[in-house]
């Protein structure tokens, strides 16, 4: 996953300009408070949440959910292999600039757009949030990180391991619905009921 410097989902307009903007609740949710308090890197050895998690997409309307804070919208949450996670947990570093085996990526929707070789549109300005701390179990993820523009970002979510496994075995390598749901905070903005689909990547 280290080589995938930019996720442009193969569904066409999953992470583009259209779509409903998720409403932000500025009162701190209990989940957000939990995420802000964690430290270090911990992981259940049985946990297998590897993959990209992208905002829920409606196949009938071709519209994806938008989880927005200021000019930035969530593009994806990525979790790498057990091997990469184990190596990172020993040193706290990946050895690759601007990369960690658990991270979030946001797009600046006010930035210019470009088009890749598949004809898909992407934003030229993105920001990755690398972890200051995380806790991973077989069905939960708690994450805290810091971005140069966005500041402190946390996510606390509940995963559906059966749904993730089914998506991995599906021909399209994408889940039929949300398999990771939770609360995202970006600075003072708290976004509840975040719904993310699993995507296997290109």
What are the roles of these predicted feature ranges?
Residues 26-39:
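Short, low-complexity, disordered segments immediately C-terminal to signal peptides
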Residues 43-202:
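Central antiparallel beta-sheet cores of small beta-barrel/beta-sandwich binding domains
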Residues 6-8, 28, 45, 70:
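Small/flexible residues
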Residues 1-25:
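Sec-dependent N-terminal signal peptides
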């Amino acid at each position: 996953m280290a080589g995938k410097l930019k996720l442009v989902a193969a569904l066409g307009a999953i992470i583009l300009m259209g779509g409903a903007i998720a409403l932000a609740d500025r009162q701190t949710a209990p989940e957000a408070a939990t995420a802000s308090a964690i430290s270090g890197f911990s992981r259940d050895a049985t946990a297998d949440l590897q993959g990209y998690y992208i905002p829920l997409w409606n196949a009938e309307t071709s519209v994806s959910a938008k989880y927005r804070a200021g000019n930035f919208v969530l593009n994806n949450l990525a979790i790498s292999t057990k091997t990469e996670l184990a190596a990172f947990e020993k040193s706290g570093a990946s050895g690759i600039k601007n990369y960690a085996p658990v991270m979030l990526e946001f797009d600046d929707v006010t930035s210019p757009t470009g088009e890749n070789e598949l004809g898909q549109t992407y934003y030229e300005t993105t920001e990755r949030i690398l972890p200051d701390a995380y806790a991973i179990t077989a069905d939960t993820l708690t994450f805290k990180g810091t971005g140069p523009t966005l500041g402190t970002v946390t996510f606390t979510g509940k995963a559906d391991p059966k749904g993730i496994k089914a998506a991995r075995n599906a021909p399209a390598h994408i889940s039929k619905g949300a398999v990771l749901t939770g609360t995202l905070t970006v600075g003072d903005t708290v976004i509840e009921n975040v719904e993310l689909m699993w995507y296997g990547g290109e």
